[in-house]
Amino acid sequence: MTEKDKAPNPEDVIEMDDSFSPQFVQEVNRVKSQIKSLIENNTTLRFFKPLTSNLGDVTAILRISFNNMMSKMEEKEKQSLVKELIKLVHHVAEKNTQDKVFIAASYERVVDELLRYANQKEVISTTLCVEGLIMTSDFRMCSRIDQEKWKFIKECIPKIDYKGIRTIIRYILESQLRRLPYQLSPEKVNELRRVEDVLLKIVDRDLNLMPPLITLSEVMRGTPKQAHMFPRLTEKLANLSSHFRPIADLTHVCGRPFIYPIPFHPAFHPPTSYWEDFGMNAQSPYTQSHHMLPYRPQHKAASCLYTFYMILRQPLGKDSLNPTNRNKTKSHWEPLLSVMIVEAMAETEALPEGKQIPRYQWDNITNLVMYGMSHLLVNPKNFFHYLKGLINQCKYTRARDEVMWIVFQVVSSLHKMIKIEDAVQEIVDLYNELFDGEFSWHGASDHPARMARFLAAASTWMLLEKNKAHKQNTDTIKSHIKVIHEAALNFDPKNMGMLAVLANAFKSDTRIGAQIVPAMSEALNTPPDPSQPTFDLSYQRKAVNQFDAFPKEFLDALTSRAKRSLLGQILSVFRSFGTDKLPSPAAFETLARICQSEDYEMAVKDLESLASRSLHISTQERAADIATNNQAKDQCHFLFDFLAYRLPHVHSYGKYTSTTGSLLLYFTASVAPNTPQNHQVYRLLEQALLRRMYWRTFHESVINHSQLFGSSYKENSNNVMLRHLKNPKTFSTPVDQWQFPLNPEIFKMTIYAFMRALKITGQEIPLDGTMHPIHVAGYGWPEKSTTFFPKWALEEIKKTDVKKLAPNYAEILSTTDEAFRMNTLLTGGQYVIRYADDPNPITYHCMLAVIFKQLCSKPEQDLTSEYYQVMEKKSPKDIVVMGNYLVDFIIADVKNNQDCNEQTFKTIAKTAALMCFHFNIHRADRFLLSLIMHPSTDEDAQICIQIANEFLLTPKFQERIKWFYENDVPRKEKDPYEYIKAIVKYHDAFPEFEACQLVPKNDDTGTNVHMPTYYGCLIERLLPILDQYVYVALEQQGYKMSNALLQLVSMFYRYHPMPIHFMYSVLFVSHGKMAGPDAKSFVSAFASQIEECHLTEEFEKYNHQKSSCEELIMELLDRMAASLDFVLTPPTFVAKDWRTAEMSPGAQALYLACIELMASPHSPEKLVNAMINVMQMRPHLRPFNVFNLIALLLTALPSTYADALHEEFIGVFKNGETANLKFEEIVFDNYDSSLLLHLPNRARSINMIAQIYWTQCNMALLNPFANDQVPKLLEHVKTEKDLWYTLRLVMPIIRRFWDSWDFAKTMRALRERFGPLVIMKLIIEKLGSMAESGVEIVHEAPFCDLFYNCKYVFVGDFLRETAITEFAKLPEAMRERLKYYVSQNEPAPPETPEREKTPERKDQQKEQQEQQHQQHHQNPQLHHEAQHHPHHPHQQPSMPPPQLIPQHHLQHHQQQLHHQQQQQQHLSQMMPPPQQPLQHLPHHQMDMAPPTPAPMHHQQHQMAMHQQMYPGQMFHHPQGGHMGYGMQHHMQQPHPHHPQMQGQMPSQMQHMVRMHNMTPQQQQQYAYMMQQQQHHYMQQQQHQQHHHM
């Protein structure tokens, strides 16, 4: 051996991990050295090298040696050896010199000979041989392509299973063809014909060598440009792609790029991934696996920006994006905002000359820009760059001041949040673009907003002085800056225009800026008339006599920074005030306008923080500092009075629950001492909490409730509040020191609102580990009021023992009678001691019932003082319990009265009115709340609702709301000053007193116990309670309400903050129960009182009787389109100011349309039919927009409308309409193309509406659709076209399931009960039954492609058993195409968890294997016994651990072990070669092949397919790292003892390990037994094959 052989070249040394033995590495290096010696040190080769390249057969000895060595290797070692040989060939070939070309060809030929000989002797598999032959070819074309070798490869292709073929085509396309030069001579192209033939054979669909979907994925993913140099291959690949066009279109909704939701839509749930993933740049790892299908460009996520655009451009639309800091939308904000600005500029150009620019949409755009930059969704430099480029192209200049105002807002307000320095040059360029050429400047000193925009450019340059941008100032800018400085020197606070400019241009840290904002704040708290410094609020509380708040026009002229400065000054006034001189109404109204014009985080958040802090301080009584206590309580009261009544509905409340949590914590703590101030604060905070939780949009209600109670007190022991909220019955008496914190009836109202929201939105919520079932079980529920409850809540109610929750009516009657009788027997003082100070639980809460009985018996007699003294000593919680006790007494008394009639209820109502309005012993809103919420049965609720009806109709109750109308009290938003003054007059006319004020006292000092009230009154407190009253009254009275009650209750809704939501929800939950005329009367009565409720004339005047249903639907759709598509000014039928509106313009038009349709006399079937006919009536400019609007309507309507659409869909089958449709018309998304030819088809329109309906609906409705409606559809499917028509609907639904982020987790949990699996199982069964009944199937190939796509993308192997059964019924050609669908090595039932091919499964397996690996290292001996314990009955048990063997036997055992290893090595050399590889068997034999004798290469192919099943990386390599000569798939395998390889060791190695502790005789017996077992398996397979054929 030469020196060179002893010391191999470092570049030739094999690099192996620890899994390979040193002997193996040594043998590999020896083979490489022998090959090198055979070629490079061959004397004959050197002599004949100039003459020929034919060496002759000089590899015979090497072949035999190589074969013997390979036969002793495991499969992994064989693969590693082949990889090293390939590296050897490529290493020589890459030395591109003239001498090395011949040598490289020789290396290739020798290695090929070795591989083919080893394959011939069955030492290596055909797959491994072909892979090696492919990779040794020199595709750099430095040497010739071996034609005979590639002919051999072509012949071997049919012998390889499809997983091996997939690897082969990957190697050819990705690893080899990429090496081709881009210019080839005709001769070299001709050499590559054999390679092209191999590829053509592999991708030929007719040969069916592997699933066509896999072929397509490999071709589209890995085809290099060099492949298109072969015309036949190029044509074949193009045809292959065209075959999958139907499947690609079928899995997408028709017109998907033009589908968009509406913010505040009941079915639009922002946190779901569906809408965010499409059009919002979501790069989910699960969206990659079938990108290889030839989708339309419109279906790419980046092309669906229209969805995001339509959400953003709607005012308040950004509030629906949740969570706000998600990066999914980040890259799209800048171009979309730029487009919106230029679009508004274009519309401004079209305005008449001299007309003022409407700022409705400009304010929205400014708010969007500020929101995007503050949340780091918009980069200033990129944004201004985009905007400058668009303006440069469009040349719009009229709205240049609005654009500069946006720039100024960014520069002025966000300098601490963003790096404005990077965008200075872009701002300068944008200014030059806007003010290029001659132009005229327009400003108005008497118009603050116009003045601020006129000087916005100059103010911007003043703030950018630090960045030296002022050096590029124009003369105009310099003159404007001079004007600003002169105005600062001659500061005039009365000049509102310049005041706004100065507040914007000078920061608070400058000398001028430090004077301006405090001067503005001082103006709000300085009375205009010094002689009248204060103004009397309700109950003679004094406030600063200033009502002139800053107008909206002035606030719109301030930047966000200036507004925040002013907000801080106002809040500082609220922190320091005198109880005899409260903050002015002007300060409150200015604060309200700032809060409504800014986002929650910029304004309301600071106010709520101050209110929460004030609440905390006010509950800490300081005995030594009474003045501080009173001031803290005053501050707490007027702040929550402002939040509850002036800002009852801020759209971002639903995202933040901190204030709600603070209120709950307040109620959790005991309120002490028992003072009238504490009573008033308690009642106010009850209202604040009720409004915060009850008046929410539907999705906000679900989110709010889930955030607060989405965990149980058992799961979250640290949350004390949840423990308190366990049982409502503990409100009066604590149990185990836990007491329900707030009024149980208020909390019950919020549960009703939560249940209605679940019904309307169709959402499903998690229940395990939450408080929701506990809360439902804690109450009694009248059955008529639970018709809309979800199934889980009804089941919880059934399990609840109603008798335990029912009050003891007999005890209540006797206790009340005794207390009433004792009033005549005891003196006043004795009576007070017994019923106020004695904590007897039976009599402690009966006083209101006693007073009620007293007034019933003697209505004309005044109440004596002892009653007031008893009430004075009750705590706020006691008053709540006493109110419920009163209702229980009334119910018991009515039930006990045998002569109960209508007059009885009138008497009760009249007495209650005396209590509430004349004697002030009880609050009317509290009494009404107890009446409608406290009853727990239908019988009790029926009694209480009749009393409530009569109570509302009493003169004393009616005169209060009529006083509002007679005095024309305006809404707070419309004229807040007149409203505050009216509230003062109202309380003068109808005062409400505390109990302490009604007790005559000798030492009365005249102290005013009333808290400061600016906005609250009885009318306001009644609004949320009347909402619930209407629901209960309709439910308990058969959804009828008297006209007198309807007219009375509707009067309150002039002041309701969410009247449209209320009307919509009432009609939704009562749909199908309230008769048409009653619904019309209900809507008309309420709509007449609501200022922003603009219904169509057709409904208001003619009740939808004048025109056809199609014309009605078209009018509603036109209104919706107008509210969504406006650019500058919204249509007249929506709110005029989006900042104070109940909802966005599009949502308002949608809700009003739904209200009309639900109250319409026409049936849902007739209206749905009209919606379909609309598409046939006239050509539509934007047909997909019409479809989308129809779907938005249907998803916002009750389920009966969807049922009508479902029946229309079934009618297509019944009428045989699919027979008139071509296959292409059904599956392809070409509806708009057919409309261009004026060929609308009703069947296609129905399918389109259904597709978009199920796209827009809530995800929770999809599983019921799969389980209930799909079977009904398939019952009517008779022909192949019917089935394709059904697939056109259900495949986009399966796709939507798949787009859900928790798709894999849900599939694993539900298995075959999961929607996509249910649908696909029904489809497969239907196709099988159709084939069995003789239905002709024309489009067989698309069906097969569809099933493969569904398997590898949507359903995996869960339906394998169904497929085996049903595919056997199909025609032979389809069975042949689908033979790979169920091809697996080991069949397993669906229950086997190992068959789940989900991403989460990989992580779980990895964690389990890592744990096993750790256990193996901790106790290797136990691990060895667990892994390799022999399972043969003749095998002896293994030896005990060494520590258990006696010392004198240990040496003997080691000698015996060494002898066994020698015998084992000798026996392994004598063992026969492995059996024929499984890929040579038919595929149905592969399915039944036993796992033990399977070759390792087949197991690894199968392992790769199983690990990449769905839904993610089915068709993809790992992206990181270089693919080492194309052999990474096999060669870079992990360590066999690594957790990933445990359980996958080669069978032969397992046999070796099992024989480790055997005697030589046992080893021979075991080897013979295994050989016989393999023979038996082969016979069994042949028998099964014969049976199958």
UniProtKB/Swiss-Prot annotation:
Compositional bias (Low complexity) at which positions?
A: 1457-1470
| Composition skew (Basic and acidic residues), residue ranges | 1392-1410
Q: Which cell locations does it reside in?
A: Nucleus
Tagged with keyword Transit peptide: no
Q: Name one Pfam family in it.
A: Med23
Q: Which domain of life is it from?
A: Eukaryota
Q: What does this protein do?
A: Component of the Mediator complex, a coactivator involved in the regulated transcription of nearly all RNA polymerase II-dependent genes. Mediator functions as a bridge to convey information from gene-specific regulatory proteins to the basal RNA polymerase II transcription machinery. Mediator is recruited to promoters by direct interactions with regulatory proteins and serves as a scaffold for the assembly of a functional preinitiation complex with RNA polymerase II and the general transcription factors.
Family in the record: Belongs to the Mediator complex subunit 23 family.
PANTHER family per UniProt: MEDIATOR OF RNA POLYMERASE II TRANSCRIPTION SUBUNIT 23
Q: What does the record note on quaternary structure? A: Component of the Mediator complex.
Q: What is this protein called?
A: Mediator of RNA polymerase II transcription subunit 23
Which organism is the protein's source? Caenorhabditis briggsae
